[in-house]
């Protein structure tokens, strides 16, 4: 515990919050090119093959982003748009690819929460 005199000499430094999505550089979304599309396994206690892509962004950052929804058409050199948002059971995955934008197709036969998956309204 500092004394009053110590606090006068050197005041308390404010806590600085660390940026959760540094690669976006304060932008809502960023465009990038897939350099590798692959599956990975989540940490315990979950079990699955989660679809992820390594994306090189327009600002030079290279990040791992999650591909949401069932089925996708992404491959190497696909141009994608990413947003922030981590995947809790995949360490190091702090971004999501936006479905239905640029080279990413929307999810087929999606009926609920369609706007999140780039799906058109069914007839």
Curated annotation (Swiss-Prot):
Record GO terms (molecular function): rRNA binding; structural constituent of ribosome; tRNA binding
Q: Name one GO cellular component term.
A: small ribosomal subunit
Is the Iron keyword given for this protein?
A: no
Positions where 3-methylthioaspartic acid occurs in the chain: 89
Keywords in alphabetical order, please: Methylation, Ribonucleoprotein, Ribosomal protein, RNA-binding, rRNA-binding, tRNA-binding
Output the SUPFAM superfamilies linked to this UniProt entry.
Nucleic acid-binding proteins
State any GO BP term from the record.
Answer: translation
- InterPro entries reported in the protein's UniProt record: NA-bd_OB-fold, Ribosomal_uS12, Ribosomal_uS12_bac
User: What PROSITE patterns does UniProt report for this protein, alphabetically?
Assistant: RIBOSOMAL_S12 (PS00055)
Q: Which PANTHER family match?
A: 30S RIBOSOMAL PROTEIN S12 FAMILY MEMBER
Query: Subunit notes for this chain?
Result: Part of the 30S ribosomal subunit. Contacts proteins S8 and S17. May interact with IF1 in the 30S initiation complex.
| Similarity comment text for this entry | Belongs to the universal ribosomal protein uS12 family.
- What is the recorded function of this protein according to its Swiss-Prot or TrEMBL entry? With S4 and S5 plays an important role in translational accuracy. Interacts with and stabilizes bases of the 16S rRNA that are involved in tRNA selection in the A site and with the mRNA backbone. Located at the interface of the 30S and 50S subunits, it traverses the body of the 30S subunit contacting proteins on the other side and probably holding the rRNA structure together. The combined cluster of proteins S8, S12 and S17 appears to hold together the shoulder and platform of the 30S subunit.
Q: What name does the UniProt record give this protein?
A: Small ribosomal subunit protein uS12
Name the source organism: Rhodospirillum centenum (strain ATCC 51521 / SW)
């Amino acid at each position: 515990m500092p004394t009053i005199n110590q606090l006068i000499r050197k005041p308390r430094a404010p806590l600085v919050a660390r940026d959760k999505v540094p690669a976006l550089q304060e932008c809502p979304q960023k465009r990038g090119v897939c350099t590798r599309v692959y599956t990975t396994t989540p940490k315990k206690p979950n079990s699955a093959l989660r679809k992820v892509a390594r994306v090189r962004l327009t600002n030079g950052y290279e990040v791992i982003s999650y591909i949401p929804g069932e089925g996708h058409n992404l491959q190497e050199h696909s141009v994608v748009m990413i947003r922030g948002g981590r995947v809790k059971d995949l360490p190091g995955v702090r971004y999501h690819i936006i479905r239905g934008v640029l080279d990413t197709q929307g999810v087929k036969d999606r009926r609920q929460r369609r706007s999140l998956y780039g799906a058109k309204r069914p007839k």
